[in-house]
Regions:
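Catalytic core of DAGKc-family lipid kinases
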Residues: 30, 39, 43, 48, ...
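ATP/NTP phosphate-donor binding region
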Residues: 1-80, 90, 300-302, 308-321
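ATP/nucleoside-binding phosphotransfer catalytic cores, i.e., glycine-rich phosphate-binding loops
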Residues: 2-17, 198, 229-232, 239-321
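Internal helical hairpin/lid segments
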Residues: 201, 206-247
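Conserved Motif II region of HX4D acyltransferases
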Residues: 88, 209, 273
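N-terminal glycine-rich "phosphate-gripper" loop used for MgATP/nucleotide binding
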Residues: 82-86
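Short N-terminal binding/cap micro-motifs at the start of the first secondary-structure element
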Residues: 37-40, 218-219, 293
Length: 321
């Protein structure tokens, strides 16, 4: 694994935002057997979870995940976990937040961006189960668009069109670039996105809109695409204009507590990487510290960008008395 992306072990104290808690007595883990090309099945995740006293629910094809999570919470579960992609994680996380239950992320998807930003070792699928038995708890924000929770981001415009393509799962970057090339050709029709920011300013001619649950770091090559924190209480917003349509800088970023967008029709979107149509107006909000998250005490680390921004450790002088 790239050492630059490996989360370090950090002390559990007030500065880390983590606190030790008693392990849940009736935890339930939902497992999507198809996520990550069958990653959970190959690791024998369900069997190993049950050995730890965790109720493992392997989801059937087309099973209603939200209903299953709500049923578990209403039935007495005192912690909910999800092994799957980030879209599935968001669905169970929203239920956990609604019932004030702790949530466990098990990185069984393809990219596992949420796990990376939590400071987990996103390649340690089995080790993530330790969160249920020897975990530490922290509170993070949860974002919503039109009442639907997301843990990472909502992408509109070029990216929103790209995630709808069948090739996206296997070749994300190439598919986005191909979509961008098609959309940017002269005469191509872009989604008519109209954004009003938190100061009342209007934005038109948008090629890409990215609204994230906390802002992304954009200044560090190795850490780019990760978030330094998940508890700032702010949405991150990134806009890219259609080239040649405006005289200002084509890219803009800022943070806000809420955001509203309108469009003439339903908008193609990628919500935590899952394709869907969102009805206008699109209303984004953030719920500060709404989600309790349990993380294995073996690696309650920081995201790559958080490590880049953290001050160097203070080392005692050799000459100190």
């Amino acid at each position: 694994m790239d050492e630059a992306l490996r989360p370090p072990r950090v002390d559990v104290d007030a500065s880390s935002g983590c606190r030790r808690v008693d392990p849940p007595r009736r935890p339930v883990l939902f497992i999507n057997p198809n996520s990550g090309g069958g990653k959970a099945a190959r690791a024998g995740l369900a069997k190993r979870a049950r050995k730890r006293g965790i109720e493992a629910v392997v989801l059937a094809e087309d099973e209603d995940l939200v209903s299953a999570a709500r049923e578990a919470a209403a039935g007495g579960a005192d912690a909910l976990g999800m092994a799957g992609g980030d879209g599935s994680l968001a669905a169970v996380a929203a239920t956990a937040a609604a019932y004030e239950l702790p949530f466990v992320c098990v990185p069984a998807g393809t990219r596992n961006h949420f796990a990376l930003d939590l400071g987990m070792d996103r390649h340690d699928l089995i080790g993530a189960l330790d969160a249920f038995t020897d975990g530490v708890e922290r509170r993070i924000d949860l974002a919503e668009v039109n009442g639907r929770a997301f843990v990472n981001n909502v992408s509109l415009g070029i990216y929103g069109d790209a995630v709808r393509r069948s090739a996206y799962r296997d070749a994300k970057v190439r598919t986005v670039l191909e979509t961008a090339d098609e959309v940017m050709r002269q005469g191509a029709v872009l989604p008519a996105l109209h954004l009003i920011d938190d100061l009342g300013h209007e934005h038109h001619h948008l090629a890409i809109v990215l609204v994230s649950n906390n802002p992304y770091a954009l200044d560090y090559p190795l850490a780019r695409g990760t978030r330094p924190a998940l508890d700032t209480g702010h949405l991150g917003i990134l806009l890219l204009d259609v080239p040649g349509e405006t005289h200002r800088s084509p890219g803009r970023t800022w943070t806000a507590l809420r955001l509203e967008m309108t469009a003439a029709e339903a908008v193609h979107a990628g919500v935590d990487g899952e394709a869907m149509d969102l009805s206008s107006p699109l209303r984004f909000v953030i719920r500060p510290r709404a989600l309790r998250v349990l993380i294995s005490s073996r690696h309650p680390g920081m995201s790559p960008s958080a490590r880049r921004l953290a001050p160097p450790p203070v080392r005692p002088s050799r000459h100190a008395s």
